[in-house]
Swiss-Prot record:
Function per UniProt: DNA-dependent RNA polymerase catalyzes the transcription of DNA into RNA using the four ribonucleoside triphosphates as substrates.
One GO-annotated biological process of the protein: DNA-templated transcription
GN (gene name): rpoC2
GO terms for MF: DNA binding; DNA-directed RNA polymerase activity; zinc ion binding
Family note: Belongs to the RNA polymerase beta' chain family. RpoC2 subfamily.
InterPro entries membership: DNA-dir_RpoC2_beta_pp, RNA_pol_beta''_euk, RNA_pol_Rpb1_3_sf, RNA_pol_Rpb1_4, RNA_pol_Rpb1_5, Rpb1_funnel_sf
Substrates-to-products reaction catalysed: RNA(n) + a ribonucleoside 5'-triphosphate = RNA(n+1) + diphosphate
The organism of origin for this protein: Panax ginseng
Keyword Transcription regulation: no
Name recorded for this polypeptide: DNA-directed RNA polymerase subunit beta''
Length: 1387
């Protein structure tokens, strides 16, 4: 007894808490040492001890035991403060909705986590024997987060869709919840209840499908004799030791393992914990183990490939139903896998980021060239470093160096003073490439109504060229200019023209007149005229005077710009052409589209005699090829294409070639240009009919004589239509050759006399020296009309010479005489082009002007179109042409009753110069203003057509005046940028005399605020030019039937004294965010757009900013009217697809059913290509293809196992790899026969076992074409050897009918078939009856011989590349670095 006591005294007393995992470890070690029976006795004693102690403790719980954490109050206050700041930033437009959501979730998550960590120390300090503390941290049941909900705060909850609700529950269950919090927490609770029910049924069904796939797999042999293995390597610390041990224990080695010359383990030895520890200490070379994947047969498994049975820790017995065990061990934990979707670590990020903190106080320095500014995912400014960055922190006595890895955010500026432990950088977490992320869309809706505006370039998404989806290239604001739209159909009628002022009592205000929006224009028009003008209504409108018209209506005609007429900007080397095609509606007749194109060089500079516009007359258009001729003998010299001289990209005329031509001729012929190698099916000089085959692919379109000419590398084949005359007939025609003969020339002949009705072309053809014949070819005659008709084409007003600019209309023929014209396919060829040529006269006073700057402004406003071609002679007054079209014309008679039949493509365009403008001002009440200062220093010009425009002259303040002058001297150029606006053109007028900032459109005239009162009386169709930060001018949409009520435009006024600092910051059209200081007397109060700048004040139109980051999609057009609740922007942001989003069961099921994942890592495709190249390069092409399918299968198997294990491990469930491997082996064991190359044994598209295909190939000694397929578990269950098993799973009738038709035989090898038919199941003891033992023993030695032979061959052929495979696989195919220990070996 004493001896025993003494022994006990020497024993180590293990004074530590033993939790669940420690208990598991203890039990497994006990089993190893003492065996099962002894261990169960020891465990009994432990159990008794536990119950005894628990009874003695007699623990109880009261509400007083729930101690709240004292620091909670200020933590929550701090978080609320941060949220408030965030809300304010969002309101100012500094962060957008997604950033705000992310940040608020992270703020609250951090708070909640911090509280949770405080909880345990708090208990330990205040009351270590608190029952809650003792029970919750014992490791028996319950976890910290549940206690946290009792005594900390409940924190963030998920809504029924699994999205986070960004309003956290601040109370805990001890304090009690408020009503809102209660409702939010009910979401979570309800989700929990539903999930549990759904989860149980899901897990049950998953188990059923799994067992179905593998029910027939039984251990049938001791050794299948395979030579394959999978390599597991503990090297380079890539995988945790725990996983390594778990992978190896219970497996069987596939190859001997050497340490230097010494063999430390032999083939077919099973691995226990001792051996594993030796492997770890020795860091041995890759260890090749046998797995179910490497077993020879798919319908059973051998003992050695399966390894130890998990129940008794020995090799599996023969006849053990390992398939069913595998299915159940994967299915059963399914009930434990949580389906909860709320997160354990930032929802929106791939794990929360790691921080780099400053080691001490000091000044921070880094190389600014290596970083570029960016935004973090929370919208904070930061620097992104693309390579390793060394940061030095200089404190008083010591210099610290900090290395920041690439792709990290630097959160401080250079030379900034940082304090110790301050966060200076954020390392991007989860940079593993195959961490799938899913893209989530978040829509931002407008919360006010008004006009949309954005202030950087916005590109059209190429997929939606004609739609309204735009992409943002850089971070910018979207603004909604507030205003109350008043929508009316009557605006579509022509009574309201743009720029009209209306009395508030006029008809569009009366609600009963605003007809339903669904009524089409015609109906509305009809209704309108019939009701209002028929005299039945008392308040009908008798004349236009009440409408207060400002514009004028003397348009020569009313045109409609067709809704779909797109602006084609054809890129020609260095200019762009804008054809203005309009379909003109004139008393219900549709006129053909005019096809006038204005041509502007990209740099916007015209020389003298440049062509500014041209018109392609459809009468002079041909589809076929041919030759042009001018007249008969005297050929006029005319402007040819070659004589247009290109000077800096501008076409210009040389006058010496301009001669009069009144008619020209076109001789059609069919031309085929063929490559020199092509075979021609017709002979030279033969005569063919229509639609004769010429070459293999082409047929003739006309009949006639064939001429074949061989050039250097091609053959030209021409077909001339016409009559053939042989010279036997004496006629004078045959003497001519290559002559045009006018109509009426007779051809006399003994038998007949014939007069030609049209012009003909006579050509003499000599096939041989003596013989010749004459071909008479038809000719198409074109008369070129002289100037009288041209006046109708271009507006006559244009052609009068004014002051010093002349425009002339010139016709020119594009092809010289006798030039062959080639038409390709169906393109039509324009023969004559009508051009508008610009010229100007030199002013004697001014120095000679060589260039004119031009720009093209296209403005669309409520169905009104203006085209301004602005031509600016540098030192003369500015000239404008305006083109006005009123699509809404409903047949109103123009005021001067002028004849409207004069359809005119350049309609009502005006060229103004000084004198002319003055006149037109008097006539038309101010269509265009030029504003000249007396001293002629600054000229400002506003393109407006109403007296509603206002002008800001040079300020009286001298300083400000200088600024303007300087800017004019600096850059008087007008740049023309070929970038897209709403119509396809947008233009920068910003530098135009710097007054271009003042271009507004149809502005309300507010010289002082009292005038606002008058505005209450009148409505007005309000549109502006919207100008963005780059000075581009955008024009609103033309289809908009919306009148903005100016009284509701939310103006506010701001007094400020102009001083040097402020005046320079204000420019018209500028947007101002909230709290931006623009005046001395404090910050600006509301965000908005500067509408009017006056000497002592500015008028600002209220606006609301929304921030948008690159990649966001903007909906709607520039200047469009938006209503509350319309979608403004869609953000696309990435959430990580880690274990949080599709978690647990759904994820496992997704993998096992081989469902596709929505988003695939971007670089995956490239990797696969690289991998394929790698294989063929190293092994040569035939081998590359041979092992392609094999490697695909092996690789996909490994990757599937890793994926499934990852899900289970993340939930803390331990499943041995071999169970998963058995199932994965079944779903990857079939291949799809891809060609009918298998000598009629298998059909293409048939699923056959991989091993069967290989054996068949060896037997037939020919290559077999098959491709690897992944079947889901359901599909694999329906593709087994046994139709009885299939039928008892799903689709019974279909399976049985098919089996009967095919005459399938069921060999009853599986368990299920035998259960269904009531036979003995072939497992356990019943297994002995199935395989005669004698045969089994004979087989093995024989196979071993083969094995060695085969092993040698395989080694020679493939696997001196073993290293290569390992490296390839680890590089290319692993989800996480953790798994790249598994390579592939086939030695």
């Amino acid at each position: 007894m004493e001896v025993l006591m003494a022994e006990r005294a020497n024993l180590v007393f293990h004074n530590k808490v033993i939790d669940g995992t420690a208990m598991k470890r203890l039990i497994s070690r006990l089993i190893e040492h003492f065996g099962m029976a002894y261990t169960s006795h020891i465990l009994d004693q432990v159990k008794t001890l536990g119950f005894q102690q628990a009874t003695a403790t007699s623990i109880s719980l009261g509400i007083d035991d729930l101690l709240t954490i004292p620091s909670k109050r200020w933590l929550v206050q701090d978080a609320e403060q941060q949220s408030l700041i965030l809300e304010k930033q969002h309101h100012y437009g500094n962060v957008h909705a997604v950033e705000k959501l992310r940040q608020s979730i992270e703020i609250w998550y951090a708070t909640s986590e911090f509280l949770r960590q405080e909880m345990k120390p708090n208990f330990r300090m205040t009351d270590p024997f608190n029952p809650v503390h003792i029970m919750s941290f014992s490791g028996a049941r319950g976890n910290a987060s549940q206690v946290h909900q009792l005594v900390g705060m409940r924190g963030l909850m998920a809504d029924p869709q699994g999205q986070m609700i960004d309003l956290p529950i601040q109370s805990n269950l001890r304090e009690g919840l408020s009503l809102t919090e209660y409702i939010i927490s009910c979401y979570g609770a309800r989700k929990g209840v539903v999930d549990t029910a759904v989860r149980t049924s899901d897990a049950g069904y998953l188990t059923r499908r799994l067992v179905e796939v593998v029910q027939h797999i039984v251990v049938r042999r001791k050794d299948c004799g395979t030579v394959r293995g999978i390599s597991v390597s503990p090297r380079n610390g890539m995988m945790p030791e725990r996983v390594f041990i778990q992978t190896l224990i219970g497996r069987v080695l596939a190859d001997d393992i050497y340490l230097g010359p010494r063999c430390i383990a032999t083939r077919n030895q099973d691995i226990g914990s001792g051996l594993v520890n030796r492997f770890i200490t020795f860091r041995a070379q890759p260890i090749y183990i046998r797995t179910p994947f490497t077993c020879r047969s798919t319908s059973w498994i051998c003992r050695l490939c399966y390894g130890r049975s998990p129940t008794h820790g020995d090799l599996a017995e023969l006849g053990e139903a390992v398939g069913i065990i595998a299915g159940q061990s994967i299915g059963e934990p399914g009930t434990q896998l949580t389906l909860r979707t709320f997160h354990t670590g930032g929802v929106f990020t791939g794990g929360t980021a790691e921080h780099v903190r400053a080691p001490s106080n000091g000044k921070i320095k880094f190389n600014e060239d290596l970083v570029h500014p960016t935004r973090t995912r929370h919208g904070h400014p930061a620097f992104l470093c693309s390579i390793d960055l060394y940061v030095t922190i200089e404190s008083e006595d010591i210099i610290h160096n900090v290395n920041i890895p690439p792709k990290s955010f630097l959160l401080v500026q250079n030379d900034q003073y940082v304090e110790s432990e301050q966060v200076i950088a954020e390392i991007r977490a989860g940079t593993s490439t195959l961490n799938f992320k899913e893209k989530v869309r978040k829509h931002i809706y407008s919360d006010s109504e008004g006009e949309m505006h954005w202030n950087t370039d916005v590109y059209h998404a190429p997929a939606f060229t004609y739609g309204n989806v735009h992409l943002l290239p850089k971070t910018s604001h979207l603004w909604i200019l507030l205003g109350e739209p008043c929508r009316s159909d009557l605006v579509a009628l022509s009574i309201h023209k743009d720029q009209d002022q209306m009395n508030a009592h006029s008809l569009s205000v009366k609600r009963r007149y605003i007809s339903n929006l669904s009524v089409t224009n015609d109906q509305a028009r009809h209704k309108f005229f019939s009701s209002d003008f028929s005299g039945k209504k008392e308040d009908r409108i008798t004349d236009y005077s009440e409408l207060n018209r400002i514009g004028h209506c003397n348009l020569p005609y009313l045109a409609i710009l067709h809704a779909n007429s797109d602006l084609l900007a054809k890129r020609r080397r260095n200019r762009f052409i804008i054809p203005l095609q309009s379909i003109q509606e004139h008393e219900n007749e549709l006129m053909p589209s005019s096809g006038i194109s204005i041509e502007i060089p990209i740099h916007g500079i015209f020389r003298k005699k440049s062509i500014i516009a041209y018109f392609d007359d459809p009468r002079y258009r041909r589809k076929s090829s041919g030759i042009t001729k001018y007249g008969t003998i005297e050929v006029h010299s005319i402007v040819k294409k070659e004589d247009l001289i290109e000077y800096r990209g501008v076409k210009e005329f040389r006058p010496k070639y301009q001669m009069k031509v009144d008619r020209f001729f076109f001789i059609p012929e069919e031309v085929h240009i063929l490559p020199g190698s092509s075979s021609i099916m017709v002979r030279n000089n033969s005569i063919i009919g229509v639609d004769t085959q010429i070459t293999l692919t082409t047929r003739s379109r006309v009949g006639g004589l064939v001429r074949v000419e061989r050039k250097k590398k091609r053959i030209e084949l021409k077909i001339f239509s016409g009559d053939i005359h042989f010279p036997g007939e004496t006629d004078k025609i045959s003497r001519h050759s290559g002559v045009l003969i006018p109509p009426g020339t007779g051809k006399t002949n003994s038998k007949e006399s014939k007069k030609w009705k049209n012009w003909i072309y006579v050509q003499r053809i000599t096939p041989t020296k003596k013989k010749y014949f004459v071909l008479v070819r038809p000719v198409v005659t074109y008369e070129i009309t002289d100037g009288i008709n041209l006046a109708t084409l271009f507006f006559p007003d244009l052609l009068q010479e004014r002051d010093n600019v002349q425009l002339r209309v010139v016709n020119y023929i594009l092809y010289g005489t006798g030039k062959p014209i080639r038409g390709f396919y169906d393109t039509s060829i324009q023969l004559v082009r009508t051009c508008l040529v610009l010229n100007w006269v030199q002013d004697k006073k001014s120095s000679s002007i060589e260039e004119a700057r031009t720009s093209f402004v296209e403005i669309r406003i409520n169905s009104l179109i203006r085209d301004f071609l602005k031509i600016d002679l540098a030192k003369s007054p500015i000239l404008y042409t305006g083109k006005r079209k009123d699509p809404s014309g409903s047949g109103l008679i123009s005021e001067n009753g002028s004849d409207r039949t004069n359809i005119n493509p350049f309609s009502s365009s005006f060229f103004y110069s000084k004198a002319r403008i003055k006149e037109s001002l008097n006539q038309n009440q101010g269509t265009i203003h030029t504003l000249l200062n007396r001293n002629k220093e600054c000229q400002s010009l506003i393109i407006l057509s109403s007296s509603n425009c206002f002008r800001m002259g040079p300020f009286n303040d001298v300083k400000y005046h200088n600024v303007i002058k300087e800017s004019i001297q600096k850059d008087p150029l007008i740049q023309i940028r070929n970038s897209l606006g709403p119509l396809g053109t947008a233009l920068q007028i910003a530098n135009f005399y710097s007054f271009s900032h003042l271009i507004t459109y149809n502005q309300i005239l507010v010289t002082n605020y009292l005038q606002l009162d008058n505005l209450k009386q009148s409505f007005q169709v309000l549109k502006y030019y919207l100008m963005d930060e780059n000075g581009k001018i955008y024009n609103p949409d033309r289809c908009c039937n919306i009148i903005l009520n100016p009284f509701n435009l939310n103006w506010f006024f701001l007094h400020h004294n102009y001083c040097e600092e402020t005046s320079t910051t204000m420019s018209l059209g500028q947007f101002i965010c909230e709290n931006v200081c623009i005046a001395k007397n404090g910050p600006h109060l509301k965000p908005g757009q500067v509408l009017i700048v006056q000497v002592d004040s500015v008028v600002i139109r209220s606006a609301k900013p929304y921030l948008a980051t690159p990649g966001a999609t903007v909906h709607g057009h520039y200047g469009e009217i938006l209503y509350e609740g319309d979608t403004l922007v869609t953000f696309i942001y990435e959430k990580s697809r880690s274990g949080d989003i599709t978690q647990g069961l759904p994820k496992v099921e997704q993998v096992l059913e081989v469902r596709s994942i929505d988003s695939i890592s971007m670089n995956l495709e490239k990797r696969v290509e690289g991998w394929n190249e790698c294989i063929t390069r190293n092994l040569g092409i035939p081998w590359g293809f041979l092992i392609g399918a094999e490697l695909t299968i092996v690789q996909s198997r490994i990757s599937l196992v890793n994926k499934i294990q990852k899900v289970y491990r993340s939930q803390g469930v331990q499943i041995h790899n071999r169970h998963i491997e058995i199932i994965v082996r079944q779903i990857t064991s079939k291949v799809l026969v891809s060609e009918d190359g298998m000598s009629n044994v298998f059909l293409p598209g048939e699923f056959i076992g991989l091993l069967r295909a290989e054996r068949m190939g060896r037997a037939l000694e020919e290559a077999i074409c098959y491709q690897a397929v992944l079947l889901g578990i359901t599909k694999a269950s329906l593709n087994t050897q046994s139709f009885i098993s299939e039928a008892s799973f799903q689709e019974t009738a279909r399976v049985l009918a098919k089996a009967a038709l095919r005459g399938r035989i069921d060999w009853l090898k599986g368990l299920k078939e035998n259960v269904v038919l009531g036979g003995m199941i072939p497992v356990g003891t019943g297994f002995k009856g199935l395989v005669p033992p004698s045969r089994q023993h004979k087989n093995i030695p024989l196979e071993t011989k083969n094995k060695n032979l085969f092993e040698g061959e395989m080694r020679d052929i493939l696997f001196h590349h073993r290293k290569f495979f390992d490296s390839c696989l680890s590089k290319n195919f692993h989800d996480t670095p953790e798994q790249s220990f598994i390579g592939f070996n086939d030695s």
